[in-house]
């Protein structure tokens, strides 16, 4: 029996769902939780798939599960198969005359806070019957979500070329790093230096994220380091609440606090920045066919930019 024929007879949807979940989540543990499976059961299914394909699809290590080149290639096909099945299912349950358009957006937490409120308001003036699903996630999760078909539109950062395969990127703006505090913070009563700032409790993004890399670069450029007693979180809402209500110093991308700075809810410390800023843009799949709702959402994001 030919190898391709054997593959097509033995491949199952559970193999594709498992593979796509691991690609999206980045670790076997998180993928197992998403699929409500035990990790050994998920590992067994993944091993079966690699035996069927005759290729190693992931490199497993301390950093999680990273797609290999054959894995990247297989992901494109796996997503198309699952998309086709989902589309077929939706077509069977769609009621004639009803608008069932759903637009799925994945955004960096700071981008969601800084960009999306006004965008969503504008969007729903035109698309009152469209369901808008918004998830905040890290940049690797946005890229994986686009490739696996979990989201239609991403608002995030350009990544390494091998991770951008199959994706389009459209620059929106450059985002600088700000150090912000509440209006009556004691630091505002003195000449501020970075070393003095770090004597106060700080809120930063977790290690491995772009905002954290920029925060580390800033403090290291002045011979300092982020204190061990810091708060690490991806939650922009939690970070904002800690900063508004207490004496925390928040290391935050500028887009997330532009309204707070304009209304003086938060104040930026006069600490010199480091670097030119981080490019934030719209991410989509190269082979995507957009619904009218998706296209209107993209247009609303573009129109929200101040240029």
UniProtKB/Swiss-Prot annotation:
One of its GO terms (molecular function) is sequence-specific DNA binding. The keyword DNA-binding applies. It comes from the Bacteria. Coiled coil: none annotated. The keyword RNA-binding does not apply. Gene3D superfamilies: Periplasmic binding protein-like II, Winged helix-like DNA-binding domain superfamily/Winged helix DNA-binding domain. It holds the Pfam family HTH_1. Residues 28-47 bind DNA. InterPro entries: HTH-type_LysR_regulators, LysR_subst-bd, Tscrpt_reg_HTH_LysR, WH-like_DNA-bd_sf, WH_DNA-bd_sf. GO terms for cellular component: cytosol. Residues 11-68 form the HTH lysR-type domain. Belongs to the LysR transcriptional regulatory family. This is Uncharacterized HTH-type transcriptional regulator YdcI. It comes from Escherichia coli (strain K12). The lineage of its organism: Bacteria, Pseudomonadati, Pseudomonadota, Gammaproteobacteria, Enterobacterales. The gene is ydcI.
